[in-house]
Amino acid sequence: GKTTILRRWRQDKALKNAPVIVHDLSEFGLDAELLADEDSPPTPGCLKNRVAALHGCHAREKLHESVANVLQEISKLDPEPDLVLCESTGAALPWPLICALTQDKRFYIRHFIVTVDALNLHRDFADGDVLTGATSCSEDIALRRASEVLAEQILFASVIIITKIDTIPDSAVNAQAKALQKLQPNATIALSAHAGVLLPQLDATLAPKLNVLKSRAEQFGLTNESATARSVDSLVIRDPRPFHPERLYE
């Protein structure tokens, strides 16, 4: 998934010291913990050792204010970073996040990247046909809401990375790429297995223009949304034993 890709990118010498903003739906900031140094856990709402953990209220009602504070802290770093990485929750609505990240004119969006899990898209959304309307959506309320959020994220994407492509047939991967390109014709489509896409491979992709993104948000009536999808709950299960899906099911 996206956290695995981000951890892979940070192994690159050029990105090792890049600050990371982690926008997390949960109350615990697990992704920020994964990206932070083991001996320096993140502090909610603050930049600590170049990792900013924005979860809980910092991911929702205080997002704009918290991002402003973090960007100010980043601007004081020495040496000054060339770029800032931001990982957001899968339940994030894109326009409020874009507004928060671009409020400080010293920063601009180089890429707006959406990751799509190939196996989930294959299993739950008919390889993207549900998103395009070619196939009717499931009656499952959760899947219907997930498809709406994903389609909205893709609407603003400059890059779409289809992850875990090794879990489905090549024909399904091709169908997914076509469906996603139909939703967002201007986006670069990248295919990834085992976090195989590197950030420099996206250099040829142009940066999205903020005025175009704003027009898109206005066109679809998305300018007054909250930062995360409504009616979405998160649950964290802690267990010292190694993860096994059968035990999770039980």
What are these regions (language model features)?
Residues 135-250:
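C-terminal accessory "lid"/substrate-recognition subdomains
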Residues 3-148:
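Nucleotide-state-sensitive switch-loop elements of NTP-binding domains
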